[in-house]
Amino acid sequence: YYTSGLLRTEQTLAALYGDVPHVQLPGLREMDFGDFEMKSYQQLKDTAAYQAWIADVEHNPCPHGESAPQVLARNRAAMDRVLAAGEDAVCVIHGGVTAGLMMTWFGGGRYDYSVKPGTGFTVTFENGRPVSYIRVPK
């Protein structure tokens, strides 16, 4: 069992699987929104920094935060560590992290892999490569 170590993933793991031993991998955390953290759309919408970021959220980093490619690289490195263990694993992670990894592995867009709390995907790997997935629960 793996989580990002952030509260939501810890709570979700406990709700789904109980008090199980697990590894916290900070590399599985969601995007660091930097200066935008804990601010609402209403607070940000008219700022130049937010407008610059929103113009290309896939490539522009949040001020003092991360870009989507930076997050994905961090997430992929963490998943490589999970896969290197060569065992079945349960990863309780964030929706954006899930979407980014699934897009990398299977193509498509982020909304193809939207998840609700407590849901996700079972991904089958062969020789370290993703070969199929199913949505859980169905």
State where each predicted segment sits.
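Short glycine/proline-enriched coil/turn segments at helix->beta-strand junctions
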Residues: 16-22, 84-88, 107, 128
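A polyampholytic, Gly/Pro-enriched intrinsically disordered region
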Residues: 41-54, 130-138
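Alpha-helix capping/helix-boundary segments
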Residues: 8-9, 78, 97-98
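Domain-level recognition of soluble alpha/beta enzyme cores
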Residues: 108-133
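Short glycine/proline- and acidic residue-enriched helix-loop micro-motifs
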Residues: 49-70
